[in-house]
Regions:
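A C-terminal functional module that forms or caps the active site or interfaces directly
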Residues: 222-290
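Active-site glycine-rich loop that binds ribose-phosphate moieties when present
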Residues: 107-108, 136-149, 153-174, 208-212
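Solvent-exposed alpha-helices and their adjacent loops that cap or buttress functional pockets
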Residues: 14-17, 22-23, 52, 114-117, ...
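Glycine-rich nucleotide/cofactor/substrate-binding loop typically near the N-terminus or early
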Residues: 27, 32-34, 40-96, 219-235, ...
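Divalent-metal (Mg2+/Mn2+/Ca2+)-assisted nucleotide/phosphate chemistry catalytic cores
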Residues: 71-152
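Anionic-ligand binding region
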Residues: 194-219
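N- or domain-start disorder-to-order transition segments that initiate the globular core
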Residues: 1-19
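General beta-strand structural signal in soluble alpha/beta enzymes
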Residues: 23-25, 58-62, 104, 122-127, ...
Length: 307
């Protein structure tokens, strides 16, 4: 039933039909994650990196009420220019946006949903949402965690954003039965930094190992996803003391201004960028590139395994 609202681009459709590797990409990073024109440049570079590493990119968004798996360069530019005017679309927003024929920038949650509808199994992004600090009183918990617990897609990221309560985020993922894998590390990376002080469930060291674990999860009939955490390259990793200080300042400002709900993450990331003199934006771009490469290599290994 949902497929009547889904448009899969010709390139992505052909790749899926032929069993070729495809990597899903989200669109909130375009509209909300970075300023124009870096957002469009980054999105196009990510697609290029995925192609260079043997897979087909499928950027996912909602345009005029249609769920799109695979965007044209013009559609990416359209989202990039519109920026914050495009609403962030989580699971709860889909029915209304579709019914009204509206645009929507897909979060990790909706990218996973639409990727699964389209038959795409690997998704590369920057970082996931999670349990916000103070969630024991606010109940501010990202829908990304629920989606990981119920949608069989591998999400390759640089860990949960360090503005979150990472310990509670890991506890929540454990409850949902989601394996948290460290790629070449036994420690959870925290987006801008390679270390967090928290362990992962398993360390795997090659795209082939990642593909084998995900393939086994599917063969076992499990309905949940898998979270692969890939540390930001050393060269672009930020000093955790600098980031922690910036986050504390950003959290204090958010509280003072009454920022909450889905406005929280874009507000905090923008403030962290200001406090770090823009260094965090460059780190953000580089970790997305790094995840795109790993996503493509893993999608290729998965296609070979199934082929």
């Amino acid at each position: 039933m949902l497929n009547r609202y889904l448009d899969i681009s010709t390139e992505v459709k052909e790749a899926l039909e032929q069993g070729k590797p495809v990597v899903a990409l989200e669109s909130t990073i375009i509209s909300h994650g970075m300023p124009y024109p870096q957002n469009v440049e980054t999105a196009m570079n990510v697609e290029k990196l995925i192609r260079e590493n043997g897979a087909v990119p499928a950027t996912i968004a909602i345009i005029k009420g249609r769920l799109k798996a695979g965007l044209t360069a013009e559609e990416i530019d359209y989202l990039g220019r519109a920026g914050h005017a495009v609403p962030k679309a989580s699971r709860r927003d889909l029915p209304v946006l579709v019914a009204k024929g509206s645009d929507g920038a897909c979060t990790v949650t909706t990218t996973m949903m639409i990727a699964h509808m389209a038959g795409i199994q690997v998704f590369a992004t920057g970082g996931i949402g999670g349990v916000h600090r103070g969630a024991e009183t606010t109940m501010d918990i990202s829908a990304d965690l629920e989606e990981l617990g119920q949608t069989p897609v591998m999400v390759v990221c640089a860990g949960a954003k360090s503005i979150l309560d990472l310990g509670l985020t890991l506890e929540y993922l454990e409850t949902k039965g989601v394996p948290v894998i460290g790629y070449g590390t036994n420690e959870l990376p925290a987006f801008y930094t390679r270390k967090s002080g928290f362990g992962v469930d398993y360390e795997l060291d090659t795209p082939e190992e990642l593909a084998a674990a995900f393939h086994a999860e599917r063969e076992l009939g499990m309905k949940n996803g898998m979270l692969v955490t890939n540390p930001i390259p050393e060269k672009y990793s930020m000093d955790h003391k600098v980031i922690d200080k910036a986050i504390e300042q950003a959290l204090a400002e958010a509280k003072a201004q009454g920022i909450h709900g889905k406005e929280t993450t874009p507000f905090l990331l923008a403030k962290v960028k200001d406090f770090t003199g823009g260094d965090s934006l460059e780190s953000n771009i580089q970790l997305v590139y790094n995840n795109a490469v790993l996503g493509a290599k893993t999608a290729c290994a998965l296609a070979a395994l199934k082929g």
